[in-house]
């Protein structure tokens, strides 16, 4: 009896540990200056899920604003200014360089990226999986000063994670790292 209880407890522990897996890689350019004002472009959608790129960009804007450490340009203003220049904000792959877009928008930095995975993985229980990459470009120099690549699998066990929750947590983690590294320290 004790043996079967220990086996059951061990199985629950293993499922809990492996129920939510993530991989994160982040980098900050040494000596990079503080972000004064950032424009977040719609993220490129490399998935089959409609609007995954737009959702990722919106989540990052919300999370950056929530920190209070970085001034974020209103996404509707970004879209309007791009349209006035005959650029389609809904097609991030065809936009000019981030430096050129940043000069047009009069911001210090431009944040852009891609959603590489946004789906439920089939199996015994469908598991949400989200992958995103992001880059922050200093408009003055044209250099990438921050990058992040996150992949996360939610838990189908005990705590039912959905795609939106996994993506929101990922955006929160990216925004926290970015604001810690390059945001206004007085706002933290």
Spans of model-derived segments:
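Bacterial N-terminal signal peptides
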Residues: 8-18
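Short, surface-exposed coil-to-beta transition loops
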Residues: 128-132
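Solvent-exposed coil/turn segments that connect beta secondary-structure elements
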Residues: 43-46, 70, 75-78, 115-118, ...
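N-terminal segment of the mature soluble domain
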Residues: 34-37, 47-107, 112-114, 147, ...
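Bacterial N-terminal signal peptides that target proteins for export
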Residues: 1-9
